[in-house]
Amino acid sequence: MALTVDVAGPAPWGFRITGGRDFHTPIMVTKVAERGKAKDADLRPGDIIVAINGESAEGMLHAEAQSKIRQSPSPLRLQLDRSQAASPGQTNGDSSLEVLATRFQGSVRTHTESHSSLRSSYSSPTSLSPRAGSPFSPPPFSSPLAGEAAISRSFQSLACSPGLPAADRLSYSGRPGSQQAGLGRAGDSAVLVLPPSPGPRSSRPSVDSEGGSLLLDEDSEVFKMLQENREGRAAPRQSSSFRLLQEALEAEERGGTPAFLPSSLSPQSSLPASRALATPPKLHTCEKCSTSIANQAVRIQEGRYRHPGCYTCADCGLNLKMRGHFWVGDELYCEKHARQRYSAPATLSSRA
């Protein structure tokens, strides 16, 4: 439906648009501010803007249409194409954003409700338990005994298995002092696992004449299997460091070679005797000051060492580390003072 709307100014006009030639969609009103000028002019979300102040908006870019609307004088004249309001029973094909939003919210609500009902049906105890009268439903208890444990749901699938024997189809609940199990066949009575009695044991279940229930002996294979499963799940875990230490100690007790241990776990007694009794390296002795050289040593000849500070000329005290030394008798001199003590250069011997 084509119509013309005059919005009284000045700007801002109180509505937002979307679309344009760059979006490949027509320019359309997406939001109208409450108690705004566009609301007073009956501008609605979903209206397609055909012309702005008489100028066609079909080829306008989005920014161009925004600029023309903002800079428009008062009144702002918009030629619109408004779709007819859909009836309550038919909303397909309608382009109104309000109707589309309502329809989307309704679909989301329906989807959420269906999922919540599905979760509740899976999580409710009634959905997991067999219906009354079904061949897998346990018989009702008229008066439960005091101290008996409720039937565990973790073994209901075992109780409902048709391929297992009647004595093996049970659900077990392990409360100390009273252990209870239920047969999964219709018409059978409950199976009670009782502690061992001093009397003779029997491998077959006996019938209790008073309560009409079956008494299962602890020597049965089903009871042993359930006990092994419980013990296997409750087995303590051992750390890898403790396991390595235990293996090393067992190897030493057997007289074998101990296994490799990390440095933080290795005992001091496992070190080799040669390493434990090794003496520290021998320190060189300075031939000038006759003290031990702890750090850096200057090697003059085989077996003759000096401190870097003692490696000096015997005449002027100049350090000979970067210059070399000259022997004159049994003393070290620099080149200058060594030449003064020898007239002939052939008598000099230089050693760097």
From Swiss-Prot:
Modified residues (Phosphothreonine): T126
Region annotation Disordered: where it falls in the sequence: 69-95, 108-141, 170-214, 253-275
Coiled-coil region list: none
GO molecular function: actin binding; metal ion binding; muscle alpha-actinin binding
Gene3D superfamilies reported in the protein's UniProt record: 2.30.42.10, Cysteine Rich Protein (2.10.110.10)
GO cellular component labels: adherens junction; filamentous actin; stress fiber; Z disc
Full protein name: PDZ and LIM domain protein 2
Source organism (scientific name): Macaca fascicularis (Crab-eating macaque)
